């Protein structure tokens, strides 16, 4: 009888282990405001799931390191891999590594360059960047009454989101309603608050005149705000817009410093990436592109988004 009971217990343990799912995730860099929200959302969601082990690694903004992490996940025999790419132009190699190993791969937040040719059992979860810069720039155009001068602060140039958001800006400013707005400067600050502040300081020192700051994310917009305040510029004299609707950005909006942001649902993207990875690991079909909607944030609807990111 004792042997029979032990046998049943062992079978239960084996069955439980067989159904456990291990997901390896390589994030572009931990030291990033939105990336931290995304990572925390993934970790919190994974904790609510029975039998799911989420292992997250920091790629430290190093493409070679990220590829090595993917190779290590493959060698460890994980059931699925999630990647927030360091360089969206380097994803073809990552896709091949996972496809050759027969392991599902989900890209999150940053669109891979090979999005239209992803192998089977691979997907992309994010928000549609056609909407992000478009929502942002249309609102800024409205606040400027369709005329004035603007400076543009771009994210990392190797990143598809930065390129797309910047294209959105140009597309909106080319419309009849907004073609009276001239871009007088356009440079990168690599998504970073400190670099955004440094860039704005340089523009102010050079005597660049502008009526609006259009930044590819909130962190760079906040950096620009800090530099403007340090230079004694009134926040009422300039329209400033970012993207992400982070807690810091919404605090700046409540203080009358930031005028426009666009909510990017970090928690929703994280949850969606894990759900897609689990479905693919079980042989279930998912859409190649899974979009979590962007939403415009202004002072009028600020309260709806506080505490979401």
UniProtKB/Swiss-Prot annotation:
Pfam families documented for this protein: Peripla_BP_4
SUPFAM superfamilies per record: Periplasmic binding protein-like I
Compartment(s): Periplasm
Top-rank taxon: Bacteria
Parts forming coiled coils: none
Protein name as it appears in the record: Putative rhizopine-binding protein
Role, per record: Involved in rhizopine (L-3-O-methyl-scyllo-inosamine) catabolism. Could be involved in its high affinity transport.
Keyword Signal in record: yes
Gene that this polypeptide is encoded by: mocB
One Gene Ontology cellular component: periplasmic space
Family statement: Belongs to the bacterial solute-binding protein 2 family.
GO molecular function terms attached to this record: carbohydrate binding
Alphabetically ordered keywords of this record: Periplasm, Signal, Transport
Classification via InterPro entries: Peripla_BP_I, SBP_2_dom
Record-linked CDD domains: PBP1_rhizopine_binding-like
Leader sequence residues: 1-20
Keyword Signal: yes
